[in-house]
Every structure is written in structure tokens, then in C-alpha cells.
């Protein structure tokens, strides 16, 4: 049987079921088998491994994962795709489709039901553009026992994930993702290999979970509050941003300035110039003065 991800087969499937693409669900189907195979290559899933997919569409990536993994679990929010997936994935008995919004699903429960204890599992997905960040954060914050992620996303978002301090793309998203994972941009995917064609190119990003976060922080929740406050207005200094936007800290500019100076951070610097290590040092220095 021909692979799903060819222009003709995709067209035939879509026409057979009278399927109309929903822009609100960010539906863009990949029609290039080479790209799909490279994505699966980067995930390095062995014959005993597992994969979690989000938004399988008509099953193009699911099919390639099913050929290599022992078990594939895919979350699909759109009920209209279920009969299509029943047909396209019929040759594979190692795939389970879950008709749920992954953001509302109990992913831990699904994980325990579907995978063996200690099984090597990767999240591999062409993520819908409009929910890329919430999905990544949900799966990272819930500490799902996966090795990592190989995910396709809007190139602009991928650039932000991998950004270094002092660059225009560096922000709270870069820090949050790099706190939990090692980030690598493994390929760029042109918009021309999708149906319908999106307005922008995509990136495939590999995120490998760190055994423990890259920096040690006393209070993780407060660390992220400090990071978010520091980027609240990019043109403002660290001093201004923290004094105006850090809600859990006393409105005391002198105290703030003294702490910054003591740890060797110039209060006139901007948030985007600080490394993740400097943010950890800063939040740890501010914690004792935090309002309870």
C-alpha cells in the first residue's frame, strides 16, 4: 500500500471522506514521506520503544511511527478524523487513537495504561501552531516519563525555544524550555510540503529531557515569576521590570537595587541579556525577601 503522505493519496483520502480543513484546529497535513522519515529518525525510537503523537491528522506521521515503534498512542481532538484513521491505520495493530484534547486529558493515566513500565517513549508530533507552547508546557510540567520530544512547529516558535541570551528571540519561553531540556533545531521544513499550505515555514526541534533542571533554584514557581517579570517590557531595564511586575516581592526599589548589586548584576541591564544561570542566582537571592 502507498504511504499516506503523498500528494495524491492525501487528496484521495480527503475527497473520499469530504473532509474540510478547520483553520481553528491548525490542520495542515504533511505530504512528504522523506520529511516524515527524517522526523522519526531524529526520535531514535527502537523496536521496543513507544511514541506519543498529538494531532495525527489522517495518520501520515502515525504510519511511519507504527512501522518502527512497539506502541504508538495518538491524541486526536477532531472526531471527523476517526473514521479516516480507522481506514488509513488499519494495517497497524500497535496504534491507539484517543479522541481527546491532550490539554484536557489525563496524560499520566493514558501513559500508565498504554505503555510498559520503563519503556523508552518519545513525544513525536506535528504540533498545531496555535497550541504548541501550552502542549509542551503541560507535558514538561506534569513530568511525564518520556525521554524527550521531536516536534514540528512554526519556525518562529522554534527559533524562540533554541534562542541564546542577547538575541531578539530570547525570552521567557527559551528559558523555560531550556530549564527542562536540551534543545536542538534539527531541520527546517518548507511550507510547500503541507496541504493546505501554511503562511510560514516550520522547524523540527528535538528536546531531550535533562536528568535534572539545568540550574538549581530554591523556589521553582518563583524562579519562573522572576523570569516572566524580567521580560514584561523588553525595552525596560531589569530594575524597572522587576519593581513593576514582580507581584510577590515588596515594592522596595532600594532593596531590589542592593540585591542586584550584591550578586554582581547591573540593575540597568535588560532581561534578555541574562543567562539562565544569572536568572537562577537572581531568583535565589530574592527568595528570602519574597512576600509570604
Swiss-Prot record:
Keyword list, A-Z: Cytoplasm, Methyltransferase, RNA-binding, rRNA processing, S-adenosyl-L-methionine, Transferase
Location of this chain's protein in the cell: Cytoplasm
Gene3D superfamilies, per database record: Ribosomal RNA adenine dimethylase-like, domain 2, Vaccinia Virus protein VP39
SMART domains listed in its UniProt record: rADc
Location, primary (coarse class): cytoplasm
SUPFAM superfamilies: S-adenosyl-L-methionine-dependent methyltransferases (SSF53335)
Domain of life: Bacteria
Assigned EC number: 2.1.1.182
Binding site for S-adenosyl-L-methionine: 28, 30, 55, 76, 101, 126
Molecular functions (GO terms): 16S rRNA (adenine(1518)-N(6)/adenine(1519)-N(6))-dimethyltransferase activity; RNA binding
Gene Ontology CC: cytosol
UniProt xrefs under InterPro entries: KsgA/Erm, rRNA_Ade_diMease-like_C, rRNA_Ade_Mease_Trfase_CS, rRNA_Ade_methylase_Trfase_N, rRNA_adenine_dimethylase, SAM-dependent_MTases_sf
Reactions listed under catalytic activity: adenosine(1518)/adenosine(1519) in 16S rRNA + 4 S-adenosyl-L-methionine = N(6)-dimethyladenosine(1518)/N(6)-dimethyladenosine(1519) in 16S rRNA + 4 S-adenosyl-L-homocysteine + 4 H(+)
The keyword Hydrolase is annotated on this UniProt entry: no
Disulfide bonds: none
Similarity field: Belongs to the class I-like SAM-binding methyltransferase superfamily. rRNA adenine N(6)-methyltransferase family. RsmA subfamily.
Function of the protein: Specifically dimethylates two adjacent adenosines (A1518 and A1519) in the loop of a conserved hairpin near the 3'-end of 16S rRNA in the 30S particle. May play a critical role in biogenesis of 30S subunits.
The protein's name: Ribosomal RNA small subunit methyltransferase A
Source species of the chain: Bacillus cytotoxicus (strain DSM 22905 / CIP 110041 / 391-98 / NVH 391-98)
Lineage summary: Bacteria, Bacillati, Bacillota, Bacilli, Bacillales
